[in-house]
Amino acid sequence: VTELFNNFKLSGWSQDWFAGYPVYYFYFPLPPIITSLLNFLLPFSISFKTMVLISQVLLVVSIEMLMRKSSKEFSFYGFGVGLLYLLTESFTIFGGNLASSLAGQYSFTYSIAFANLSIFYLIKSKHKYSTEIAALLIGLTVLSHLIPFMIYLPIFSFYFLKSDTIIYKKISAFLFFLFIAIRFSISLFLNLEFTTNMTYTPYTQISDLVKSDILPFVLGAVIYFILSSSKNSLKSISVFEIYLISISIYLFFYGPESALWNGRI
């Protein structure tokens, strides 16, 4: 808060050291920037809690919108699935659900929400500037957290290149994305050697993956596909869903140990 607006610094917020390495030299900037803006109106503690609360609402909204049959038709299935995912307690620090966000991973939650919305605007929205909005949202994804961006980028690129949008709009959208993300991305990759290893150990048992509290999520997804009456709706999201399932299975069974790194310095 003090460094961003007084000195216009997007990095170097902390000059502290831990074990010989700079600690929190910078973090994903978007949520802290918004928190800093709110701090002009509210106490910092209230601003921070407000950002956490907004991330929870935005996550559920993004999943609901992503599962719509059309751009303006509310999806009760999507709302239910989003709510169940938010309330799952199988994990408490990986990010996305309520427990993880309250533990401090609300940046991850924002990243997932923005990524979901970017896919929605790319494949379902009828908005005149849907491609540009999608580019903005995928840029906000990387500014919120790196890991969801890395997972969503391939499928976003597939839909982006596959779309019938005229070429000059695609180029302008791509340049818009670069304008948003390039400053942070360059800083991150130039200093990648200083990022911290989370000593992540991947799960190897199915019982670790399928917990009792996510069974309603699985059941809701099955019911959605069975009862969906729109074949076009299923087609429009089938590639996206197959991709997410495939990449999740691959990372679950073949993700190397200690391969998950914090995008922070």
What annotation goes with each model-predicted range?
Residues 1-265:
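Membrane-embedded transmembrane-helix bundle of lipid-linked glycan/lipid transferases
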